[in-house]
Structure formats: C-alpha cells, structure tokens
Amino acid sequence: MTHDGTWSDESDWEAVEFELDEAAHAPPAPVVAVVGRPNVGKSTLVNRILGRREAVVQDVPGVTRDRVSYDALWTGRRFVVQDTGGWEPDAKGLQQLVAEQASVAMRTADAVILVVDALVGATTADEAAARILLRSGKPVFLAANKVDSDKAEADAAMLWSLGLGEPHPISAMHGRGVADLLDEVLAALPEVSEVAPRPGGPRRVALVGKPNVGKSSLLNKLAGDQRSVVHDVAGTTVDPVDSLIELGDRVWRFVDTAGLRRKVGQASGHEFYASVRTHSAIDAAEVVIVLIDASAPLTEQDQRVLSMVIEAGRALVLAFNKWDLVDEDRRELLEREIDRELVQLRWAQRVNISAKTGRAVAKLVPAMETALASWDTRIATGPLNSWLKEVVAATPPPVRGGKQPRILFATQAAARPPTFVLFTTGFLEAGYRRFLERRLREAFGFEGTPIRINVRVREKRGARRR
C-alpha cells in the first residue's frame, strides 16, 4: 500500500473483482416456504431460522408488510426463506386463504414447512393446506409449534392425522427442536433451486398493479386481439401459471397470468394475498410492467407496487392506463404532475395506453426491449474508473466528521440489475450516491433499470492487524 492509502498493485482489486463475480454468477439458492394459519408462529420461526429479528412477529389483524423473502445460512449452506404470513384472519375466509397460501408455496418453493399450533391441534384450514401440499410432490415438513416441554410432545403426536408424516415438535419462540428441523429440511433441498427461472428462452414479463387497474384487459388485448397466444404452460395442478405471447416478432413469457385471469374472492385478507401474488410474479420476471390508472391520482398502493419492483431489482416499464379517459387539454398538465410525483423514477420507461381501446399498447414492446437491454448492461472496469475519476475531480464527496472520504476504485459487480461497488476511505452520504447514480445514467444510459451502488469502506491498517 502506498503512502496515500491506495493499493500499490492491482492484485487486491483483482481478488475482490473475482469474489464479486463469483457471487454474481452463483446459481440460485433453494427456497423454503413457511406456511400456516395466523398466530401459529410462522414469523417467529422465520426469525429463528434467520438468527435475527427481521420478519414481522405479530400475526394479528392489520399486520402486513411487503417483503416476504430473506436470505438465510445454515451449516454453511445458502437458502432463501419465504414468509407467507401477515394477512388478517377471518373465520369465513380462513380456509380459502390458507389453501391459497399453500398453492403459491407449491409454485415458488423447493420445500415447504407447514406450521401448526400443537396446542390447538389440526383445524380444517390445516387439513386443507395439507391436502394441497401432498399433491405438490415437493418435500413438506410439518412443524408442530409451541411445544415447550416434553409433556407437550404428546400434543404434537396428534398431528400425524394430517398425513404429512412425522410432526417435528418445535418451539419457535425458544428455539427448541428448530435445529433438528432445519437439518432435515436442508437434507431434502436441492443444491440449486428448481423453481428459480432458468436463463435463456423467452424474456419473462410480469404485469402488476393495484386491483381493477386493467391488468386482465391489457393481457387480453395483448393476447386476444393479435390471436398470438402460443399456449398456456401448466405450472401446478391448481392452475396454469404462465402465458407465451408473440409480440414484435418475438415470444414473451407473461408470468403468473393465472393470478390475473381469476377473480380473487372477497374473503378477508385477499388484498394481502394479492400482494403475495404480486411479489411472486415480480420475483419470477425479468421486466415488470406496472399498470397505473391515469384517470385517478397516484395512490399509496401504486407506490408500494413500484417499491416492490425496485427492491427486487427488475427492469421497469410504467404503463399509464385509461389515458383515453383523460381530457385532451389536461394531458400535458398530467404529464408534469406524474414527473413531479415520480421524480425518483425518471429513468423508467413510460407509456400512456388504453387497454380497452388498444391505444399505444404496441409501444410497450420497444419499452420492454430498451429496459431489458439496460438491465443486461455491463461496463468494463477501465472506462468505469476513467469516468469516476473525472466526476470525483469535478465534484468530490462531501466532508464527513472533518475528513473527506476518497473513492479509490470502482467495479461493476453484477448486471440484472447493474450493481456497482465503490471502494472508499470513508462513508459516502446517500445524497452523494444519488448524485453518482444520476451521472452514471447520463454517461452510460441505463434507461428502464434500477441501479445499485454499494460502498465498501477500507479498513484501517491498524484494525486489520488486530
């Protein structure tokens, strides 16, 4: 290392780049879904598996959240935990919702843990979920929760009646039996996820948005008017999942179209479950079309869906539907309003359409192609650091704690979405990272894709020796 704190040769950077490249190209980790009725301890079990308090722990009415998947590590193996809890219980719709939960888990997970309250015993909702999971052909593990003593294990034994094999007595709250359960789950998991989308084949598109925004109408317009549906692909015994549609001389795979075509019942909790399906579709997609009602003000629900797409790191197309309902003299004003409200998403591809009349629907294809090309983009290390040197020389990072952090080196760690790592001598303020993102877009494009900028602060030499 030289006197100014930079590395004297490139070997350190090459080692880090190799490490990042390995991580970026790692095969998708297997997925374990945790399902069950409210109040049985799903989120507590997820937290226990993660070893940190991250999932919501009260499955009580009104407790919902957007994020449902977490990276986990057990005995050196990476896997993903999918928490499907969080919807509001209601006696009328409970069985239907647990069954729906199990159905989604069958499609999106490599193995399933069904959590049952051993003190309550098997309910009709538990039985409905068990029947669906048995048909999946996937490894299913029955976690008999709230077994806090040897005496309570007798309650767990009663759950043999569900037909899922031996119940695993656990206490998610205190950790009892969870390690043994995880050992068995991981032994049954494939090394690489069998449900993760495979590279190659038609590009995968998710069509998402709040209820009644016109998703089904747009899907039917894309498929029906052009008579271009190739076929529906059977995903499970429950419903067909994807549709292959030919648009613009290529075939696109629209994911989870079953969720669009089937009307969700009015049972309590269906709005949360729509959120789970939205997550499922976004996770399976490469590019996401978010439908927004142009004839009504932007809602919190619209913003929440957009946040899901950004967090998932998917290419994005904004489709403002029902544009035909907007008065001609108001359209320019509305465009400016949208610019103001979505100022952080100026990079997104935007198309004003009418799913009903077909207005501008054809423009969705070039928008998707542009977004995906940006999503796939990689910038070589040399040009990236030349650009960075010029930007930092003109506008250095702000002083923090009396010291000015220096950016030593940058590399693109991954594409899909483009992810950059900056090696620095100190923390970079969020505002400066946003500034760098804007400049990155000005220099290299990236229309239609989120960009991630991560910072690695160099350790002090004394700290490293200790």
Swiss-Prot record:
Residues 30-193, 203-376 form the EngA-type G domain. CDD domains: EngA1, EngA2. GTP 1 binds at residues 36-43, 83-87, 145-148. InterPro entries: AAA+_ATPase (IPR003593), G_ENGA (IPR031166), GTP-bd (IPR006073), GTPase_Der (IPR016484), KH_dom-like (IPR032859), KH_dom-like_a/b (IPR015946), P-loop_NTPase (IPR027417), Small_GTP-bd (IPR005225). GTP 2 binds at residues 209-216, 256-260, 321-324. Residues 377-459 form the KH-like domain. Keywords: GTP-binding, Nucleotide-binding, Repeat, Ribosome biogenesis. GO terms for molecular function: ATP hydrolysis activity; GTP binding; ribosome binding. GO terms for biological process: ribosome biogenesis. Signal peptide: none annotated. The keyword 4Fe-4S does not apply. It comes from the Bacteria. Belongs to the TRAFAC class TrmE-Era-EngA-EngB-Septin-like GTPase superfamily. EngA (Der) GTPase family. NCBIfam families: GTPase_EngA, PRK03003.1, small_GTP. GTPase that plays an essential role in the late steps of ribosome biogenesis. Associates with the 50S ribosomal subunit. This is GTPase Der. It comes from Mycolicibacterium paratuberculosis (strain ATCC BAA-968 / K-10).
